[in-house]
């Protein structure tokens, strides 16, 4: 009798995806982040569900309902901070996962990569609308500033902004619809993640060398299930340490002040995981230009497979490209730092230079390095 996991229609799908999946024998810990993202998504949906049971999406009660969750609900403070810091862990894993894809040339699986970019945009949208829900000062002003960027679109901009707001300012209608979006988007993310996996399993995983590994595969279970469990334990340990010792480390103190349309905070800034894009937006002294640069800073990922000039897929054996890759990481960290600073000298010029370098590295320097390395192969 054949094992039920290989014959049952549902079990067969799970078996082919997580048990008998042929996997390269040499994939490193950088390949752990996919499963960690799945874990983050499950945790966010569960903690979010329990928060939604006590939260009220209404301008008059939203802030106090969050306070009620933290004070009166059993372990409500714990669920709330797990959810808030879980978002940070989600983005850490997301950026590591994308970085791995860039370094090892995983973007050559184009369908998988493009759905990944779509996933990134959806997660960013979810995090943005979620940040508005506690209805603190930074929630309100963040929503006002970011939605207002759409008014830079010629002709239809203003109408579009008012349509999204549901009125002439960020108000009750905006909060209600943002709650609806924040509830539905994670399920859309789950569906997209399933398609992401579907396309990945059409080709099989890439590996650190970037060389096809068809002749050297091992079953996913037990080798990588145990490795994923170790990664999951480390993720949970980090999340618990963050939540229980410094729950407000990554948050903004302004969000503990209820939203007030009559008082603007001194420095409006998004959560840390959006600061690099915010810095690029601010570095261009023109509204439409800034919005386009902001969009392009993320959408540039779609063009990366087209910018591949090297004959080698991975950067493992390409020292020049490695140097440029780590320069890009340093540049993104610089942009993240600048995004959190006030708009004054010297931060303005540093932000502008870092923004120029960001696009220069991806569009010019890295493809050029690939061509130079191709020449070196002939020596």
From Swiss-Prot:
User: Which is a GO BP term held by this UniProt record?
Assistant: mitochondrial electron transport, ubiquinol to cytochrome c
Q: Specify the domain of life of the species encoding this protein.
A: Eukaryota
InterPro entries, per the entry: Cyt_b/b6_C (IPR005798), Cyt_b/b6_C_sf (IPR036150), Cyt_b/b6_N (IPR005797), Cytb/b6-like_sf (IPR027387), Cytochrome_b (IPR030689), Cytochrome_b_C_euk/bac (IPR048260), Cytochrome_b_N_euk/bac (IPR048259), Di-haem_cyt_TM (IPR016174)
Q: Which residues bind heme b b566?
A: 97, 196
Signal peptide location: none
Q: Which residues cross the membrane?
A: 33-53, 77-98, 113-133, 178-198, 226-246, 288-308, 320-340, 347-367
Task: State a single Gene Ontology molecular function.
Answer: metal ion binding
Enumerate the residues binding heme b b562: 83, 182
Could you tell me where this protein is found in the cell? Mitochondrion inner membrane
Its cofactor is: heme b
Q: Which UniProt keywords apply?
A: Electron transport, Heme, Iron, Membrane, Metal-binding, Mitochondrion, Mitochondrion inner membrane, Respiratory chain, Transmembrane, Transmembrane helix, Transport, Ubiquinone
| Keyword Transmembrane among record annotations | yes
* Membrane topology classification: Multi-pass membrane protein
Free-text function comment from the UniProt entry:
Component of the ubiquinol-cytochrome c reductase complex (complex III or cytochrome b-c1 complex) that is part of the mitochondrial respiratory chain. The b-c1 complex mediates electron transfer from ubiquinol to cytochrome c. Contributes to the generation of a proton gradient across the mitochondrial membrane that is then used for ATP synthesis.
Quaternary structure note: The cytochrome bc1 complex contains 11 subunits: 3 respiratory subunits (MT-CYB, CYC1 and UQCRFS1), 2 core proteins (UQCRC1 and UQCRC2) and 6 low-molecular weight proteins (UQCRH/QCR6, UQCRB/QCR7, UQCRQ/QCR8, UQCR10/QCR9, UQCR11/QCR10 and a cleavage product of UQCRFS1). This cytochrome bc1 complex then forms a dimer.
Family label: Belongs to the cytochrome b family.
Identify this protein by name. Answer: Cytochrome b
- Taxonomic source organism: Delphinus delphis (Short-beaked common dolphin)
